[in-house]
UniProtKB/Swiss-Prot annotation:
The gene is ligB. The keyword Transmembrane does not apply. Its EC number is 6.5.1.2. It comes from Pectobacterium atrosepticum (strain SCRI 1043 / ATCC BAA-672) (Erwinia carotovora subsp. atroseptica). Catalyzes the formation of phosphodiester linkages between 5'-phosphoryl and 3'-hydroxyl groups in double-stranded DNA using NAD as a coenzyme and as the energy source for the reaction. The active site is at K129 (n6-amp-lysine intermediate). This is DNA ligase B. SUPFAM superfamilies: DNA ligase/mRNA capping enzyme, catalytic domain, Nucleic acid-binding proteins, RuvA domain 2-like.
Length: 563
């Protein structure tokens, strides 16, 4: 029920419902010059997308992302330029007048506001908010004589010829009034579409594109019609639905249900969100039967109907910061810290970018807007950078040349992250399995300058541990015993703890073999073990013959750890 020609007004809400909390709009901390630059730049970008949308009939970005950026622009304008209203630009060729104006829908998401709206009205009905493009159909003496796009609500494009090629739009009606007007949604017909899992799939843009093509395509046969308004139609909703069904508009009756409370609306909203449907939806519409006469309708929000939208599959968030971490093997990972948002039932404030090189390709910095969705197993995924701020802050990233498979076996300020990652791996279940030694404990020892390299802890005394702030006698004793238990571990456990790149399927290759024998193995001999190919064999041999690893093994040998 929405096309890119509506005027969006910012709605600031304070509550949330249905597991989808609303977030109050916060004005950016910008001076007027910066605000003007950002507002102008985003407005120009939206206008470029509008031009593509109207001239080529396709959307360069997802519909729900466009909607959110349009709302973002209006929010900024409310903050810094409240005297200006920034509507979406309309196509130049929308000159066909509507016999009855298309109204808009006020969108509510606050529980208190929704309940209040419902209790103040009677004879209410709920429908799915079908996501397509709005149209006016005019019938005279049972014959379709006009079809007009929504446009600005007062006039739009003449779609009559295209409408006559859509099988789902009846051309001739029997038993119809002599002259009447319908308003509805042209949608892309789907098979068992589940909104919660599949999202909008840009169905709206596909329909809009087809309706603006000069030459018809097979897509026309995939377009359906959902009638949601009959200006000056039967007064009672049951009579209105029966008459629509009799004339060939049965879908409206199938998906319009009486409600008496907010709980009823919530039930249908959840049902349609998860159930297979023949169309894409982006929420529900709650409407009262009583409406003013069509001649009084205006292209503003109606007061007899409201929308309660679903959370978008792709949510737009501001990038607050860029965080870098260096892992055990020296790989630099990048994570974006974003303004908190809700995806399904998950609160998300961080999203993984991947490698340093990928972050540079994304060119994403604080102040940018990114599109985020849920990937498999509910993991937040960065989909795209949908808007870049006009000012590009300088972010100093780690030099990836400083980190590799053999860096940071010794502590330094630069090495802190990789060094800690090595220790966490060493004490974990894949290594020595040392009780009580997790990242927090290793950090405490590092902060007390007790760890010069990855073996320094082996020589700590109980007294040194007891001197660590907040340790206590019993805790110090337990940690000391845990650390010393490593002396009883085999050489194979130690090699795995230090990071030898032997896959778990080939761990038997390390059992009951001394250091010299391991070093003397050839690449061909290593490849005899499960999961070890040519490249992995070379990595294992490089590990066994690296000077720092050889030094560490020599120290273990002095401690009686041979095989």
């Amino acid at each position: 029920m929405w096309l890119r020609n509506s005027v969006f007004l910012i709605i600031i809400v304070v509550g949330g419902i249905g597991g989808f909390p609303a977030v109050a709009a916060v004005c950016p901390d910008w001076d007027n010059t910066r605000a003007s630059k950002e507002i102008d730049a985003l407005r120009q970008q939206l206008e470029q997308w509008d031009d593509v949308y109207y001239t080529e009939g396709k959307s360069p970005i997802e519909d729900d992302v466009y909607d959110q950026l349009r709302e973002q622009l209006n929010q900024w304008s409310q903050c810094f330029q409240p005297q200006n209203v920034i509507p979406a630009r309309l196509p130049d060729n929308g000159k066909q007048p509507h016999p009855v104006a298309h109204t808009g829908l006020k969108k509510l998401s606050d529980r208190v506001q929704l309940v209040q709206w419902i209790v103040q009205r009677e004879d209410l009905w709920v429908q799915p908010k079908v996501d397509g493009v709005a149209v006016t159909l005019v019938y005279q003496h049972g014959k379709l004589v006009s079809a007009v796009s929504r446009g600005n609500g007062l006039q739009g494009e003449d779609w009559t010829e295209k409408a006559r090629l859509i099988p789902d739009i009846p051309h001739l009606l029997s038993g119809a009034p002599s002259s009447f007007v319908l308003q509805g949604e042209l949608f892309l017909k789907m098979t068992d579409h589940r909104q919660y899992a599949q999202g909008g799939v840009n169905a709206r843009s596909i329909v809009a594109g087809e309706m603006r093509r000069h030459q018809p395509s097979p897509v026309l046969s995939q377009i359906g019609l959902f009638v949601w308004e009959w200006p000056d139609g039967p007064k009672a909703m049951p009579e209105r639905l029966d008459k629509l069904k009799e004339m060939g508009f049965a879908m409206t009756a199938d998906y319009t249900h009486a409600i008496e409370s907010f709980a009823d609306v919530e039930k249908w909203r959840d049902h349609w969100y998860h159930s297979p449907l023949p169309f894409v939806t982006d929420g529900v519409v709650i409407r009262q039967t009583k409406e003013p006469q069509g001649r009084y309708w205006r292209n503003t929000s109606a007061d007899w109907a409201i929308a309660w939208k679903y959370p978008p599959v792709h949510q737009v968030a501001e990038v607050v910061d860029v965080a870098f971490s260096v892992g055990r093997t020296g790989k630099v990972a990048v994570v974006l810290k974003i303004s908190p948002l809700k995806l399904d039932d998950k609160s998300v404030s961080r999203v993984n970018v991947g490698s340093l090189s990928r972050w540079k390709q994304w060119d994403v910095l604080p102040g940018d807007r990114v599109s985020v969705s849920l990937a498999g197993q509910g993991i937040p995924r960065l989909d795209n950078v949908v808007w870049r701020g006009t000012e590009r802050p300088v972010i100093v990233s780690p030099d990836e040349h400083n980190f590799h498979a053999f860096s940071c076996f010794r502590y330094s300020v630069v090495c802190q992250q990789q060094f800690l990652a090595r220790l966490v791996w060493l004490s974990g279940e894949h290594g020595l399995n040392l009780a009580g030694m997790r990242d927090g404990m290793w950090l405490r020892l590092m902060q007390h300058d007790l760890l010069g390299d990855v073996l320094s802890w082996l020589y700590l005394t109980e007294a040194q541990l007891n001197a660590v702030n907040g340790m206590g006698d019993k805790r110090a004793r337990d940690i000391y015993m845990s650390l010393q238990s490593a002396r009883q571990k085999s050489l194979s456990h130690w090699l795995l703890a230090l990071g030898i790149p032997v896959p778990r399927s080939a761990i038997s290759a390390l059992n009951n073999v001394n250091w010299l024998a391991l070093q003397q193995r050839t690449a061909q001999q290593w490849r005899q073990f499960s999961g070890i190919g040519e490249r992995r064999a070379e990595e294992i041999m490089a590990f066994l013959n690296h000077p720092i690893v050889m030094e560490l093994i020599a120290r273990l040998d002095l401690e009686g750890i041979h095989r």
